[in-house]
């Protein structure tokens, strides 16, 4: 697994997301990585997250909206990482390659227990310059609890506040 999280390479001006922004101390601060040294579109991405009690749906189980948020942020982070790799650029170099969610589809497979560390695995389905499709599985205790598909598109210049 790589040592620097994808989200930690985002410019400070683009690091306020509630789900994964390093500058949002109230948020989840999800951290995504390459699962191995195979850092390409055939590689897998990974993240871990342990839900706090405030994300309880009913006693003992995680709120589904949290799972959707984690899938979303792991998908867009994975999209950014593969875009940098495809461009033969180091993650975090300017101009930024940030992706935003164009579509998110989540299926809840099994109840997600509280108290367990969640593991998110991202698999690339489609990789293009301005569009990346990532399939994400969320597991707890080695049981798949949710699956999601993120269609991530390159962030339009109108959303960028970074001067290169």
Where are these regions (language model features)?
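Exposed regions on extracellular, virion, or secretory-pathway luminal proteins
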Residues: 39, 60, 109-111
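Non-catalytic linker/capping segments at the edges of enzyme domains
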Residues: 1-58
